Amino acid sequence: MFKILCSTGALLGKSNNRDYKLLKELSTKLTCDGFEFMMYTAWYEEVEALITALKEMQLYIPVMHCEKHIGEAISKGEFDEAYRRFDINCYIAGEIGAESIVVHLWDGITSDAHFENNLAAYGKLKDIADKYGIKLLIENVVCNQEDPMKHWCELKERFPEVHFVFDTKMAAFHSQMDLLY
């Protein structure tokens, strides 16, 4: 029932130019049940090549993590760009067989300074994810105004169907680890 997933973000970074082609070799060196595929901004230029490469690798990828600037765009009120990028991320997720997609609903320097933008955007993001048959998961990202748990409660109140993913590093930053139990 439970699976141990490795984030591809732990394997691909600046030191190896975030070369997704390295996943084929690197994935064989790990003992895990599957992967959370982490999307990066640089890959928007080559979406089809990315999808083809991932399919050829035949990795089990039940979860995709959206490119992190989506939440920052939402926070800044750049909704059209955020929705465009999120749609691309959902398309990729669907093509590689992911069942769920993680998004930072707020992020960057703006973070949760305009949480009303982030709250307003959730419904549209959910509609886009639903179009691809993918479950949307909201991560407890670090805040610079309030805290993630407060925002999760606001989301749950307004959207009872919302699903979350709990990042222990983010929770520790806000001293919210105990709230999981």
Across the structure, where does each feature detected by a protein language model lie?
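N-terminal pre-domain/capping segments
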Residues: 1-90, 94, 130, 159, ...
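Active-site-proximal loop/turn and secondary-structure-junction residues that shape catalytic pockets
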Residues: 10-12, 39-43, 67-70, 105-109, ...
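Gly/Pro-rich active-site loop or hairpin
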Residues: 16-17, 24, 72-80, 112, ...
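Acidic/histidine-rich catalytic cores of soluble enzymes
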Residues: 34-35, 128-181
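Active-site-adjacent beta->alpha loops and helix N-cap segments on the catalytic face
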Residues: 43-53, 110-121
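Short, electropositive alpha-helical surface patch
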Residues: 55, 60, 114-127, 153-162
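Short glycine/serine/threonine/alanine-rich loop segments
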Residues: 59, 98, 134
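Active-site groove signature of glycoside hydrolases
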Residues: 89, 93-113, 137
